[in-house]
Regions:
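A short, exposed helix-loop element centered on a Lys and neighboring polar residues
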Residues: 113-114
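Conserved glycine-rich cofactor-binding loop
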Residues: 14-15
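Conserved NAD(P)H cofactor-binding loop of Rossmann-fold oxidoreductase domains
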Residues: 82-87
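Conserved glycine-rich Rossmann-like NAD(P)H-binding loop of the short-chain dehydrogenase/reductase
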Residues: 28-45
Length: 120
């Protein structure tokens, strides 16, 4: 499969697996749009990835996702890597953290997919 000339949006790509994937796709000729909550982290990440640009997004905020999807434009592929995790036991559930994990890890993904699927 050739990635040359393709555009990929990587959400949660300012570090770790997302950044590594952005670097790999770029090496294969793809244009990559990196997104995360931190503009500063994205600036550092994009500096090391040719054919990249950044769009800040908070996947827990529907308006932010809508704005980001509009800024990203048409894409050939989407990779959702955003996520948070706070370990907790069933005996010590922290409702606010549990809700945040669900909102970012699951609902956030659904928000992003819903925003870009009509354009793909």
């Amino acid at each position: 499969m050739s990635f040359a000339g393709k555009r990929y949006w990587l959400v949660g790509a300012s570090e770790g697996l997302g950044l590594a994937l952005a670097q790999a796709l770029s090496r294969e000729g793809a244009e990559v749009i990196l997104s995360a909550r931190s503009a500063e982290g994205l600036a550092v990440a994009c500096a090391g990835v040719p054919r990249s640009r950044s769009v800040v997004v908070d996947v827990a905020d529907s308006a932010s996702v809508t704005r980001a999807a509009q800024a990203v434009g048409d894409i050939d592929g989407l990779v959702f890597l955003a996520g948070v995790y706070w370990p907790m036991t069933a005996q010590a559930v922290k409702p606010e953290q549990l809700e945040a994990m669900c909102d970012i890890n699951f609902t956030g993904c659904a928000r992003v997919v819903a925003a870009v699927l009509p354009k793909m």
